[in-house]
Each structure stands twice: as C-alpha cells, then as structure tokens.
C-alpha cells in the first residue's frame, strides 16, 4: 500500500475542501469516498423512482442491485456505467438517500475493495466517515475534522444557497443533526474518533488555518 492520509469527520466539518488542498500540497491523489456512496445512491434513486425510505428494501434486494453497478473514479470525477454523474450526485436529495444506504453493510462491503484499490497504485488523501477506522486503519497519517452542529449547518446552508437550492437554516441544522445520528449510531462502521487520529475542531478556524495545521503535523511526523 502507498502512503495514505486518511481524514474523517462529520458532514460539514470541512473534510472535502481541506482534503483537496492537502492532496495538492503533497502531490497526492484526492479520493472523495463520499462521492462513491453518492454514486450508489444516485443509481438507486433512479432505479426506484426516488422513494423516500430505502429501509423498505431488503438486504438481498440491495445486494442484487449492487451487482449492476459499475463505478469509475478519476481526477475527482465519478462515472456510473460510463456516465459522468459528478454533478448529479451533489443534489441534496441524493445526499439524503446516501445517508440511508450508507448504513447498509452490503453497500459498505461493496465499496470497500474499490476504495482500497486506489492506495495500491498512488499516494492518496482519502476523506470520508470511516477512513481512519475501517478502510485504512493502517494509514500513514490520520486526522479527524470536527465542528459544532451550528457551524456545520451554517456552512451547508450557505453552500446550498450559493448553488441555487432553497433551504432554511433550520432545515440545514435539522439535516446535520439527523445525519450525525445516523452516522454515529449505525451498526456498520459508525463514525468515531480513532484513538491515533489527530483531532482538529474547525469551528473557529479559517480554511487556511486548518490546512496549515494538517501540513505541519504531516511534516513533524514524516
């Protein structure tokens, strides 16, 4: 396995932006594992006509559908059966479906080999919910980015408004709290702080400050 910088944390903690910049600074490839889960969710949303509750599907039904999914990830873009779905998977509705499906063990088992395969070829910065604990437990460097629910909701609210989506701050906060509950309480690979991960609370830090802290820590322990 090549060098892996694994970054975990809840939704809205700044993982994606920080991870991209860290990868750029180190000359590593960036792996957005959340995009892989979103691609699966996008497939299921189309297949089942955007049903609201995917818990209605049995594990066997999900497993059968996974056999039809072919995901390719390159340069930050996600392809589903050859189609670039990178923009479609960012829809808030897909995010909700992703949060539901990611609790399923069959989905996590399906994506595990794909995620790990990237580290066999190149040095990577991998961000997600279980990078430091499950996918890359022996990662070269481990970080956990966090922030208060209010701060994360504000970031999500501003991001969605800028992208043209209509949402209130209260809705954004409720979504963050619900995601936290699902991520931390799920039976399979719950979100948790790895004992050997470096913890960073980004609530009152600028993006550049977070990046500087991560790069300094990487340099110190290199």
UniProtKB/Swiss-Prot annotation:
Top-level taxonomic group: Bacteria
Pfam families: Cytidylate_kin (PF02224)
GO cellular component: cytosol
Predominant place of localization: cytoplasm
Protein's name in the database: Cytidylate kinase
Binding residue positions for ATP: 9-17
CDD domains on file: CMPK (cd02020)
Keywords: ATP-binding, Cytoplasm, Kinase, Nucleotide-binding, Transferase
Family annotation (PANTHER family): CYTIDYLATE KINASE, CYTIDYLATE KINASE/PANTOATE-BETA-ALANINE LIGASE
Cellular localisation: Cytoplasm
Family of the protein in this entry: Belongs to the cytidylate kinase family. Type 1 subfamily.
